[in-house]
């Protein structure tokens, strides 16, 4: 009997034993860095001369791994392997597939410190964030395994005299997973193995910045005994193989987490029926946000400031759920702003190997983009805190607060994906909700209020997929906070929800006459 689902815990780094353990994990991982990693197609490891170099964003002289780069022919071979593996994998019972996934999660649990340590180096994640990422990966796998067991027998439908009816679920086929670099293990593992436990096969194209951690999942899948070809590992240049993966006639579904521009491109291209394709593709896309914390009058300003600062600057603001807009009632605006500035000054920034609160941003492109937005912010509003940048060794951006903004300013409209939060002053709660909704995105939001009527208004009118009361707008927990957004934030395919696997299943009805 499978035990009841419970979330995987992190490590308490106030306990010296845990600190020492994780320092050892970091040292052990560092010894393994710089190696070449292969493609994995039909279980075969294929090393290529052309490679993607993964570097430590906190120390760009440190090479994390050299990932073999897949060509279109490699992708074609991977599709053939996945299609062939699907013939057998789809015949496994739901329980057998789920039990294999539970074995995968057990292996990850034993290697949790190693997995987290890799993300400290490869993604520049702070210790707590890296451990949380690894733990969330376990949660996704465990949750989806149990979800598949729940769906195994289908759902009851009505019978009538002389007729027995069955309603059940079947897998779709081969699909493509394109995960992000900001949650390089949790989202990557969840969006890869959800369709797999549902009986499908997958081509996994990892983020260019974080291929090493994705390859570790491939090692774990092999150790767990996943049949060859069920998951095929094809890192590569998106300009070379991205469209090919999406357009392919055998791609039944695409799971994507990333930018709005790429997500809408995938959605558009997936709508085209290719020659030899006799089905319609499904797209599961999460495309970011412009998330706001609304602060009402007559509230605890300390709590409001803490919610804003932790939501804005955790993992250097590189979360699709990060707070990039603080919408504050005029009566508490100055106090909340002042307290937010004070808290921000206390944050530590540096190489996350040293357990700093904030680390680097992921790469030079993002660094330059964020730096440019800070300059825009200086023109549109007032720079209150931070604004400094340094790419002499890594890609470091100070936590930045810009005040005096208007709703239509670029800082308040465009996704920055870095440690920058803009403050706007509003006259009342109605205006606050109006400003909160004045964006193309609708992922997360939070409301700090003691007014129940205002909270009810926010529940009904604040147009986001995940809304929180009197807390920050980040840190959704699998099983508690199914995650996904509205509008241009994506398809609202709630990850970590009882419905998520339905995106990778077809419903079949069988009616038998007696």
UniProtKB/Swiss-Prot annotation:
EC top class named in words: oxidoreductase
UniProt GO BP: glutamate biosynthetic process; proline catabolic process to glutamate
Single GO molecular function: 1-pyrroline-5-carboxylate dehydrogenase activity
Reaction(s) this enzyme catalyzes, per UniProt: L-glutamate 5-semialdehyde + NAD(+) + H2O = L-glutamate + NADH + 2 H(+)
Keyword annotations of the record: NAD, Oxidoreductase
Presence of the UniProt keyword Protein biosynthesis in the record: no
Xref: InterPro entries: Ald_DH/histidinol_DH, Ald_DH_C, Ald_DH_CS_CYS, Ald_DH_CS_GLU, Ald_DH_N, Aldehyde_DH_dom, Proline_metab_enzyme, RocA
One of the record's GO cellular component terms: cytoplasmic side of plasma membrane
This protein's pathway: Amino-acid degradation; L-proline degradation into L-glutamate; L-glutamate from L-proline: step 2/2
Entry's EC annotation: 1.2.1.88
Protein family membership: Belongs to the aldehyde dehydrogenase family. RocA subfamily.
Alphabetical list of PANTHER family matching this protein: DELTA-1-PYRROLINE-5-CARBOXYLATE DEHYDROGENASE 1, ISOFORM A-RELATED, DELTA-1-PYRROLINE-5-CARBOXYLATE DEHYDROGENASE 2, ISOFORM A-RELATED
Name of the molecule in the record: 1-pyrroline-5-carboxylate dehydrogenase
């Amino acid at each position: 009997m499978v035990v009841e689902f419970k979330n995987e815990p992190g490590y308490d780094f106030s306990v010296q034993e845990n600190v020492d353990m994780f320092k050892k994990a970091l040292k052990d991982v560092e010894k393994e860095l710089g190696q070449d990693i292969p493609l994995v197609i039909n279980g075969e490891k294929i090393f290529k001369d052309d490679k993607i170099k993964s570097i430590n964003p906190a120390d760009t002289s440190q090479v994390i791994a050299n990932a073999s780069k897949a060509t279109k022919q490699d992708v074609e071979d991977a599709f053939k392997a996945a299609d062939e593996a699907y013939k057998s994998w789809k015949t496994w019972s739901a329980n057998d597939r789920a039990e294999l996934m539970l074995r995968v999660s057990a292996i990850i649990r034993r290697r949790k410190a190693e997995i987290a340590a890799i993300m400290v180096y490869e993604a520049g994640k702070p210790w707590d964030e890296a451990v949380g990422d690894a733990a969330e990966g376990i949660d996704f796998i465990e949750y989806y395994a149990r979800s598949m067991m729940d769906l195994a027998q289908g759902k009851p439908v009505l019978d009538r005299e002389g007729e027995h009816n069955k309603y059940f679920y079947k897998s779709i086929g081969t699909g493509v997973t394109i995960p992000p670099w900001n949650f390089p293990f949790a989202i990557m593992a969840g969006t890869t193995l959800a369709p797999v436990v549902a009986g499908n096969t997958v081509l996994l194209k990892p983020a260019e910045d974080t291929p090493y951690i994705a390859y570790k999942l491939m090692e774990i899948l092999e150790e767990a005994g996943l049949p060859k070809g069920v998951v095929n590992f094809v890192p590569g240049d998106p300009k070379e193989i991205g469209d090919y993966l999406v357009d392919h006639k055998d791609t039944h579904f695409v799971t994507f987490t990333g930018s709005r521009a790429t997500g809408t491109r995938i959605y558009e291209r997936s709508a085209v029926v290719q020659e030899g394709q006799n089905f319609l593709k499904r797209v599961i896309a999460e495309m970011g946000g412009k998330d706001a914390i609304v602060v009402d009058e007559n509230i605890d300003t300390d709590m409001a400031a803490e919610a804003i600062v932790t939501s804005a600057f955790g993992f250097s603001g590189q979360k699709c759920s990060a707070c990039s807009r603080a919408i504050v009632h005029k009566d508490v605006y100055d106090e909340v702003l002042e307290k937010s500035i004070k808290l921000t000054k206390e944050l530590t920034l540096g190489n996350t190997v040293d357990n700093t609160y904030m680390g680097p941003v992921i790469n030079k492109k993002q660094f330059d983009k964020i730096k440019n937005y800070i300059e825009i912010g200086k023109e549109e509003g007032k720079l209150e805190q931070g604004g400094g940048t340094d790419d002499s060794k890594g890609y470091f951006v100070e936590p930045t607060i810009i005040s005096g903004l208007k709703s239509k300013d670029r800082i308040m409209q465009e996704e920055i994906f870095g440690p920058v939060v803009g403050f706007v002053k509003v006259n009342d709660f109605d205006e606050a909700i109006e400003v909160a909704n004045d964006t193309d995105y609708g992922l997360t939001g939070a409301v700090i209020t003691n007014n129940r009527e205002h909270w009810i208004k926010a529940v009904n009118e604040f147009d986001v997929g995940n809304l929180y009361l009197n807390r920050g707008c980040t840190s959704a927990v699998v099983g508690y906070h199914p995650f996904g957004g509205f509008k241009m934030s994506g398809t609202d395919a709630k990850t970590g929800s009882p419905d998520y696997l339905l995106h990778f299943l077809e419903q079949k009805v069988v009616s038998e006459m007696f």
